[in-house]
Amino acid sequence: MFVLASASKARQKLLDQIALRHKVIVSDFDETQLQEPDPILKVKLLAKAKADSALKKLIEENHALNTYQALLGCDSLFEFKGEIFEKPIDKEQLISRWQRMSGQSGFLHTGHCLISLDNSKSDRESISQNNSCDGVVSTRIEFMNLSNFEINKYASTSEPYNCAGGFAIEGNGGLFIKKIDGCFSNVIGLSLPWLKNNLEKFGLSRLLLDR
């Protein structure tokens, strides 16, 4: 069994897509604690903090670690001209950002922290230090030129407010993306190629396609 340290429905759907049976344990980590201006370092640190927090919760709640093989923490943000765009706080901010993003491009960064729990004891620190790997996957996204009508119409839906950058490529936001360079699933919330490669490094590829 695999543990996903995220409440993101989009990430859960990606794991369902590859038939990776999983349990969701949401991290208690307060993201506002981390004030890091570098977007790539920030998502990397946040992914690790979320994974460590979920691992701590797993142990404190007396879950039998031998029933789980791996745990994944993720965090995503959108970088636009050196500025970090996380989830928009309101409609006004979303519209302002989309007016700037229209016809331009930026980068969706997702930090990943994978912890192997195979044959692990209940020592959280040693597990995290000795059986983990982390990395950041970045995808360049180019947007179409949008009218104010299109921007306002999208801002009137609930979709963009739960997404880094204020768009969901797998939803209505996909209408406004001209092209991407890089990993598609990374834009949704986690890079499936990154996950596959690193599960293989831990000898855990058996977890994939477990229908």
Curated annotation (Swiss-Prot):
SUPFAM superfamilies: ITPase-like. The active site is at D75 (proton acceptor). One of its GO terms (molecular function) is nucleoside triphosphate diphosphatase activity. Keywords: Cytoplasm, Hydrolase, Nucleotide metabolism. It holds the Pfam family Maf. It is an enzyme of class 3 (hydrolase). GO terms for cellular component: cytoplasm. Its cofactor is a divalent metal cation. Coiled coil: none annotated. It catalyses: a ribonucleoside 5'-triphosphate + H2O = a ribonucleoside 5'-phosphate + diphosphate + H(+); a 2'-deoxyribonucleoside 5'-triphosphate + H2O = a 2'-deoxyribonucleoside 5'-phosphate + diphosphate + H(+). Its main location: cytoplasm. Nucleoside triphosphate pyrophosphatase. May have a dual role in cell division arrest and in preventing the incorporation of modified nucleotides into cellular nucleic acids. This is Nucleoside triphosphate pyrophosphatase. The lineage of its organism: Bacteria, Bacillati, Cyanobacteriota, Cyanophyceae, Synechococcales.
